[in-house]
From Swiss-Prot:
Residues 56-149, 471-563 form the BLUF domain. GO terms for molecular function: blue light photoreceptor activity; FAD binding. Residues 842-855 have a biased composition (Polar residues). It comes from the Eukaryota. Pfam families: BLUF. The keyword Lipoprotein does not apply. Residues 813-827 have a biased composition (Basic and acidic residues). SUPFAM superfamilies: Acylphosphatase/BLUF domain-like (SSF54975), Nucleotide cyclase (SSF55073). Residues 420-444, 813-855 are annotated as: Disordered. It is found in: Cell projection, Cilium, Flagellum. The 1224-5/9F strain is deficient in phototaxis. It is not known if this is due to defective adenylate cyclase activity or defective BLUF domains in this protein. This is Photoactivated adenylate cyclase subunit beta-like protein 1224-5/9F.
Length: 855
């Protein structure tokens, strides 16, 4: 029986044959209507009735065996024997499929029975990383009894395409899932696309946890090789305590952690934050002399309010919480420095506490929060003070002695080309733009094609004359955009056979029930060109690709083959298509949230830990005066502002060959190749020009985006790129002294007139023409060295006019009379945004070193 589903599951129709379903779908012009092959058989439920007499649910999960050597057909056969006996007694049915070391399992039964069995599976020491791929109601059983016979992939099929794609996508899928925020990961696993979900207002308790004086720790010349160790410790401590208390970690921002809880877990949140402070304070007694983690201390701010849970951006996305309350939380965290308190929380948080915890609170303190006209009431618990100046003095006096970190920092340009890691996308761009402000060029989408082009540049032996000993295997899975008839498949087969024979590509294309699975072998360049053609094929969608290390010899014969999976595989295991479909969609969606360098390295069969530390330039962008703009804006307007901003930034950045490091609401950080500073300047020019033209396009409309202005800062220096975390959540960090310094350079965009929209700290890496004619020095200096701005009146930023325009917008929308300019000058007493600790992105340690003026 075949089932056709459309209108997001609201309409369902069954057919006896696949041709009937395909004809009905084509005649009805349904573009998004998946078809499922289902075998329904009677079975006895745990309550003794038929499967129609009880509510059935189908649970599908992926796990990894803790001992891959034992995950062989004999091991799976023993699992089948035991599971058949036990699960038949309670009325469970399903199948188990193995592709060592991964296990795919679908279970059907009642809610109570499934919950009980999955709890046992999760606690089974033979499994780890149990990931739920699907958990939804079903109308009938695919298997009348517990079916595990011939469940090993080697037994059910001889097609290497199926074994390859399941193993490779499962490996990359489970690895990349650790980089995703839990909310986005849960949506992907439930079959939802986070980008398609509408923004959801939520009442949450939010915290920002800072590593005290982390910028100074990065700037210390004796600790530049230890940031990875410091951050890995910080990530592990936060994950253990925050997630253990029911919190959800939204993101890590170098030395900062952002997390949230539901309002009924406020006491658990404060307890977890206090425990983090205590755990870090105990590190000095547990570390070897000269180790940087002995200098780790934390300070946190906690606040409660309404925020918008939403997806911002398209090409590169950030699934996060947005809202004015989020900015206020980060400002409360910066006040902890002034009050020397490890944990500081607002009056709204205090109202959510029970009587017992309220009795422990010290007296209230009223203080001015940056960006707010009205003071904020804060509270703290009694305990030892956390003096930032004392911590800074310890860092200045720090010497590692004989202690040496295992991670060595090297110069990217000094490495031989064959040994350089593929952390930069230097693929040819479509229609390169001239280096002139405001020049429009066709945007190049950043997709999974780019990492696979980068994969072709990985170091490796050259292709031999025959191409048979060094050919890599590339696999992909995709969905047909329309029903494929035998004539369509014959046309695909004829074209593929002719073209691939000329390119010396061999492999297998498997088709069944609207699903394409393909593995191919051949020269790298030919495979990449073929992949590009596949992605441009309008007959396919949701193309998810993966890559295997190079085999010693070809697996496939010289002839290209096409196999119909309907008769040989999918008819035997109907859920197999569902497994592949869900893995493909989730794997494709992950790329927008996971750093591209991680995707490219994982899909090339490498470990991200092996990425060598390099020296590179850093660019940082920021929406100026966002706090005063969002203070009187609704949550949907905040989301609209950040969504527009995040869409514009990665487009301009990736177009110039850079990589996005982090999307942080109204801030985007990225890195450029150290030898291509001119591209960083061109990207900054495009961003500022886009913002100006966007404001001009809606100048006659009362739209909050009409007051948005960008400030862009450029700096270069040495950073460490490393994978941090071992407690289930992984963060790929890019950290160095330049990470903190570029934030201070960005503060020049709000300095005294003229305000430079694109300041840069060093001009050493610019081309002679741009250095001599394209930049001018600024009055401000950082660390005794001059800063520069891009020449031209169009690149000056008038913050006073921006703030005046914001207040005029709010006054016009509320029906009030706008203030005149003299009155505005008298009343404009808001301290605005000081970049030391701004929005959860500022390191506390860099304060007091600069001579720049901030508002």
């Amino acid at each position: 029986m075949y089932i056709l589903v459309w209108k997001k599951g609201q309409q369902i129709k069954t057919f006896h044959t696949l041709d009937e379903a395909a004809q009905f779908k084509a005649a009805s012009n349904f573009d998004e209507a998946p078809m499922f092959s289902v075998t329904v058989a009677p079975a006895i439920s745990a309550s003794g009735g038929s499967n129609e007499a009880t509510n059935l649910r189908r649970l599908m999960y992926l796990s990894k065996g803790t001992n891959p050597e034992e995950c062989n057909p004999q091991f799976v056969a023993e699992l089948a024997r035991v599971a058949t006996i036990r699960n038949r007694e309670i009325g469970l049915s399903g199948f188990l499929m193995s592709s060592s070391p991964f296990l795919f399992q679908a279970i059907e039964g009642t809610d109570q029975d499934l919950d009980f069995l999955f709890a046992k599976i999760s606690a089974d020491p033979r499994h780890e990383r149990c990931i739920v791929l699907a958990n939804r109601p079903c109308t009938g059983r695919m298997s009348g009894v517990w079916h595990m016979k011939d469940s090993h992939m080697d037994s059910i099929t001889t097609h290497d395409a199926m074994m390859t794609i399941l193993y490779q996508i499962a490996r990359s899928f489970s690895s990349m899932l650790t980089y995703l925020p839990k909310r986005a990961g849960n949506m992907l696993l439930s079959g939802l696309d986070p980008a398609a979900q509408p923004p959801e207002p939520k009442s949450v308790v939010v915290t920002f946890i800072y590593l005290v004086a982390y910028g100074s720790l990065l700037s210390n010349p004796y600790s530049t090789e230890q940031p990875a160790e410091v951050l890995s410790t910080f990530v592990d401590v936060c994950v253990k305590n925050l997630e253990g208390s029911g919190g959800i970690i939204t993101k890590f921002i170098t030395g900062i952690c952002m997390a949230s809880w539901p309002f009924n877990r406020t006491e658990e949140a404060l307890t977890a934050i206090q425990q983090i402070s205590e755990d870090l304070a105990q590190l000095p007694s547990q570390q070897a002399p000269g180790s940087s983690p002995s200098l780790m201390y934390s300070q946190a701010g906690v606040h409660y309010g309404r925020a918008m849970l939403c997806n911002a951006g398209s090409g590169k996305s950030d699934f996060t919480l947005l809202g004015d309350w989020i900015n206020t939380t980060s400002r409360i965290a910066t006040l902890a420095k002034k009050l020397t308190s490890p944990v500081l929380f607002s009056f709204q948080v205090r109202c959510l506490l029970g009587d017992e915890m309220r009795e422990e609170i010290e007296g209230a303190v009223m203080d001015q929060v940056k960006g707010r006209d009205k003071p904020v009431v804060e509270y703290q618990f009694p305990g030892p003070e956390r003096d930032v100046e004392v911590v800074g003095q310890k860092i200045e006096q720090f010497t590692p002695g004989r202690f040496r970190c295992q991670m060595r920092v090297g110069q990217y340009e000094a490495l031989p080309i064959s040994q350089r890691p593929p952390i930069f996308d230097d693929t040819p761009k479509c229609n390169p733009r001239p280096r002139t402000p405001g020049c429009e060029g066709r945007q190049r989408s950043h997709t999974l094609v780019d990492p696979h082009i980068m994969m072709a540049k990985l170091p490796g032996p050259s292709v031999s004359a025959t191409g048979d000993t060094t050919v890599p295997t590339l696999t992909y899975i995709s969905h047909a955009t329309r029903p494929m008839s035998r004539l369509d498949l014959s046309a695909i087969m004829g074209t593929a056979t002719r073209i691939n024979a000329l390119q010396r590509i061999t492999g297998t294309l498997l088709h069944g029930n609207g699903l394409f699975v393909q593995t191919q072998e051949g020269p790298k360049e030919a495979e990449i060109n073929l992949l590009l053609r596949i992605r441009q094929d309008t007959r396919r969608s949701d193309v998810a690709t993966d890559h295997m290390p190079q085999p010693q010899e070809r697996v496939y014969p010289s002839e290209w083959t096409l196999t119909s999976g309907k008769e040989e595989i999918l008819a035997i295991f109907p859920p197999l298509q569902d497994v592949l479909s869900r893995l493909a969609k989730s794997f494709t969606a992950q790329e927008t949230y996971v750093p591209s360098r991680v995707v490219s390295y994982l899909t090339a069969g490498n470990n991200p830990r092996e990425l060598m530390p390099v020296s590179c330039g850093v660019v940082m962008t920021d929406i100026c005066s966002l706090t005063s703009l969002t203070e009187n804006s609704c949550l949907s307007e905040v989301w609209m502002i950040c969504n527009t901003f995040i869409d514009a930034c990665p487009s301009a950045i990736c177009q110039e060959g850079a990589e996005v490091i982090k999307l942080i609401g109204n801030c985007v950080t990225a890195y450029f190749p150290g030898n291509n500073a001119d591209s960083a300047v061109a990207s900054a020019q495009e961003l500022f020009t886009f913002c100006r033209e966007h404001r001009q396009a809606i100048v006659d409309v009362l739209d909050v985006r009409g007051c948005v202005s960008y400030g862009v800062a450029l700096d270069n220096g040495q950073v460490v790129m490393a994978q941090c975390g071992s407690e289930g959540l992984t963060e790929y960090v890019v950290a160095g002294a330049v990470s903190a310094r570029v934030m201070e350079v960005e503060a020049i965009t709000r300095g005294t007139c003229p305000r430079w929209a694109t300041p840069l700290w060093s001009a050493d890496r610019l081309s002679p023409q741009l250095r001599d004619h394209g930049i001018v020095p600024t009055p401000q200096a950082i660390e005794g060295l001059p800063c520069y701005g891009i020449a031209g009146e169009e690149f000056e930023l008038d913050v006073d006019s921006i703030k005046l325009g914001i207040k005029a917008l709010h006054a016009a929308r509320s029906g009030e009379k706008p203030l005149t300019e003299p009155e505005e000058a008298k009343l404009d007493f808001s301290p605005g945004r000081v970049r030391h600790g701004d929005s959860g992105r500022r390191s506390n340690s860099a304060q007091g070193k600069l001579s720049i003026q901030v508002r």
